Amino acid sequence: MKILSKSENFKQEYCCSIIKVGTLKPIEGSDFLAQTFIGDASIVVRKDQVKEGDLMFYASNECQLNEKFLSANNLFEIGCYEKNGNAKEVKELLEAAERCEVELSKDCTEEEGESLRNERDEYKAKAKTKCGFFSYNGRVRMIRLKKTPSMGYLFSKEELAKYCPKVKDINMEDYLNIDFDTVDGELFVKAYVPPVKEHSRRGGKHNKRDKKVKQFDRIIEWSFHYDTDMLAKNIWKIRPDDVVTISNKIHGTSVVMGKVKTRNPKKIAFYKRLWNNVVDTFGIFKNSRFIDYTVDYDVVYSSRGVIKNQYINENVGPGYYKFDIWKEATDILAPYIEEDMMIYGEICGWAEKTQIQKGYDYGCKQGEFFVMPYRITTKKKDGSGTKYEWNVDEVRQWTENLVKEHPELAEKVHPITIFYHGTLADLYPNVKVSEHWHENVLQEMMNDKEHFGMEELEPMCKNKSYREGIVLRIDDDPFAEAFKLKCKNFLQKEAALIDKGEVDIEMQDAYCNNGEEN
């Protein structure tokens, strides 16, 4: 068994990796703090603890770290010191401080009082130095130090070895830039999701999205949308001469719809039904089972990870918004979906009286919404049955032509916003290919207000809300994948909402391995 590995529910956006510390940049107003970058993530470090070239472990922002690891390294904050390995020592210091408080409540001279206060404060300060800064939930959150954002957590091999001694034997170079979420067979890190507020729903638990389709024997072929990985961790996949499409990442809720083959039950004789029950119950003579269905094309739709058609998924409820926004969106496009065609899109605006994403109206009035298709797949016309993945520009052209032919859809269907189509070498000609091209191009994109409006307000919204970010896809990519780059201002706002315990449907659906969503 590998000491560092990936679990079945591994998510690249919420994991750990071994990295080499890059350039340390001074931070104005501080003699001992410095800024470095892990991919696109800014992180603040102490110059006396972290040096350029060090090999360290990095935990992504908004992760939840293993409680035993935090305890072994005394990383829980003073408010939950009982979770730390040195809890007894900290308790003794706090009790000593409390005894000073008791003495202060008695009659004492001014000199004695000052001495007791100093002694009390020393005990409290010492107790605090023996604790960390993680809250009880072990969440890695974005903070600002000297106005510099710090996203993620760096820790050493020695720290991890306190939790898992076997780590002492690994060669860090062998794992450089490798992602993992499991240490020696135990889940070490996962996405942090605050306690979910109750919504009207019913149904079962999530597993991997595409695996869940198998439970619905009426669907013959269906694919949920793949996870969009972080560009920072995949920038090495992009070559300077790759033709890429960079589009606006909008903040809504996912919808998947397609006209796919489904099995529709048909009536058969009683004795045939009886025989089929025997076959199904005992799992024998499967080849002699009577056919009790017809195969037809039907429109099926889902959220990011849950089939929504009630005749297929009988346990599905109205969902997070108490209103089937996914059906409403599908009804708009259903008449124009061809056989074996699947459309992946984003729904933005309002679900009746509820904003789909708080603060992100995208120009919609209350009760209004629109669908933005961003991905389409069909079958190749060579008879092979192979899936054909459309390029982003083809998706945009299809949407624009649809609206042109059916102008009544103009308010309900919006084409994807493409910021750039071409090579990154042409976009950033001043970035030398021979000198750390990937790292430097990533930095250019992170700060590109001219082409992408990074860190700016989203002009599509009436409210003052920051742009979420951008999505990059390689044209004619043999792999179905896309990469996202989120704005720091958006991430900071998202972190503030998580602090309040506000969880949107995308977070529930995408990051709760065992969450529910109907």
Features from the language model and the residues they span:
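Core nucleotide-handling region used for phosphoryl-transfer chemistry
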Residues: 2-518
